[in-house]
Amino acid sequence: MTDQTSLQYTAEHEWVQVDGDVATVGITAYAADKLGDVVFVELPAVGDELAGGEVVGEIESTKSVGELFAPIDGTVTEVNDDVVASPDLVNSDPFGAGWLVKVRFEALPTLLSHDEYVALVGE
């Protein structure tokens, strides 16, 4: 599991872990809990160009369907095929095996710190 305090976050409940010019992206445990049992995940394809703030995928649960937003501009370099095959990883390990995509970026926008995100969700 990733150290959650070292991550950056969006108001749309995604987390971002930066390693050089590649960001690993997932949804937070808060979002996974609100969704309920995740049963389907649709992700962008490797090579897709993402624009920050745009819808890039979908996540379906037994309770609802939610949109996945690109937290940053960039190019998808890897998708987590394990999550596509076993969507429950989003619930069981959202900050680890439940990551969604890796994106190569040129500039990182200002995102929320862990403390700012915790204040946003009130937990």
UniProtKB/Swiss-Prot annotation:
Q: Which GO terms describe its biological process?
A: glycine decarboxylation via glycine cleavage system
Note the InterPro entries from the entry: 2-oxoA_DH_lipoyl-BS (IPR003016), Biotin_lipoyl (IPR000089), GCV_H (IPR002930), GCV_H/Fam206 (IPR033753), GCV_H_sub (IPR017453), Single_hybrid_motif (IPR011053)
Q: Which residues form the Lipoyl-binding domain?
A: 22-104
Q: Which Pfam families match?
A: GCV_H (PF01597)
Q: What are the N6-lipoyllysine sites (modified residues) in this protein?
A: K63
Per its Swiss-Prot or TrEMBL entry, what cofactor is needed?
A: (R)-lipoate
- Cofactor stoichiometry and binding? Binds 1 lipoyl cofactor covalently.
Instruction: Give the protein's biological function.
Output: The glycine cleavage system catalyzes the degradation of glycine. The H protein shuttles the methylamine group of glycine from the P protein to the T protein.
Family label: Belongs to the GcvH family.
Name the PANTHER family on file.
Answer: GLYCINE CLEAVAGE SYSTEM H PROTEIN, GLYCINE CLEAVAGE SYSTEM H PROTEIN-RELATED
Q: What is this protein called?
A: Glycine cleavage system H protein
Species name: Clavibacter michiganensis subsp. michiganensis (strain NCPPB 382)
Its encoding gene is what?
gcvH
